[in-house]
């Protein structure tokens, strides 16, 4: 919850935000067949308000510069030209959370890489062990640029109906032959084909007979190859 405040979430919204994600995240996992029996949520303010944690925040700050914090937070926090101090505290607390949550691994998108490196470099200076850091690619937005929470057309929201999802994908930017910044292809690669592989299923691209009829793919790489060669296109 407190991390949200450090990244400009209004204080009055924090508790509602926490309850929302606590309710939604298990449903996401269940929708793809994950057993959530051992899933546990830890509220940040339950341990981040304790004296020892705050002391470590101060201690951590003596090992890093303002520029170190700015660099670490640059792809995650909305800093702007005149950043608030809160945004510079953010990477310090995210790093310390590894120790205070006693985790073996921290997982995040590739936009988190600078904070993850920051944690690995600085935690040992406080006498804490570095953790394993795992990153996965971010899916580009559906309008040909980075996905943005402020632009509903650029993303598929957790609360979107089936009709909304179909409408957004139907109106997505999908330049023929181009793979870079193609949100539709990324959605296929990292989500659809992953689910198909887990279920030992093939992906069927439905087409009218006048366009060659249906095409079946066992893997994403073959689909991408055909897309680049414009054998298939929007």
Predicted regions and their residues:
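Generic signal for short, ordered secondary-structure residues
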Residues: 4, 71-72, 148, 167
């Amino acid at each position: 919850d407190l991390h949200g405040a450090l990244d400009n979430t209004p204080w009055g919204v924090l508790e509602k935000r926490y309850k929302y994600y606590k309710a939604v995240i298990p449903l996401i996992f269940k929708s793809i067949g994950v057993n959530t029996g051992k899933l546990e949520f830890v509220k940040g303010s339950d341990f981040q308000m304790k004296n020892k944690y705050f002391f470590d925040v101060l201690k951590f700050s003596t090992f890093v510069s303002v520029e170190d914090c700015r660099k670490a937070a640059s792809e995650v926090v909305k800093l702007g030209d005149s950043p608030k101090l809160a945004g510079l505290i953010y990477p310090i607390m995210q790093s310390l959370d590894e120790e205070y949550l006693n985790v073996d691994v921290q997982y995040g998108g590739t936009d988190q890489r600078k904070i993850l490196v920051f944690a690995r470099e600085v935690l040992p200076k406080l006498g804490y062990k570095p953790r394993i850091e795992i990153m996965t690619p971010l899916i580009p937005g559906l309008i040909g640029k980075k996905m943005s929470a402020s632009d509903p057309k650029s993303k598929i929201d957790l609360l979107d109906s089936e009709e909304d999802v179909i409408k957004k994908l139907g109106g997505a930017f999908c330049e023929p032959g181009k793979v870079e910044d193609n949100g539709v292809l990324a959605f296929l690669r990292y989500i659809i084909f992953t689910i198909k592989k887990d279920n030992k299923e093939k992906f069927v691209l439905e087409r009218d007979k006048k366009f060659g009829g249906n095409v079946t793919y066992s893997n994403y790489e073959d689909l991408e190859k055909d897309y680049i060669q414009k054998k298939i296109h929007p």
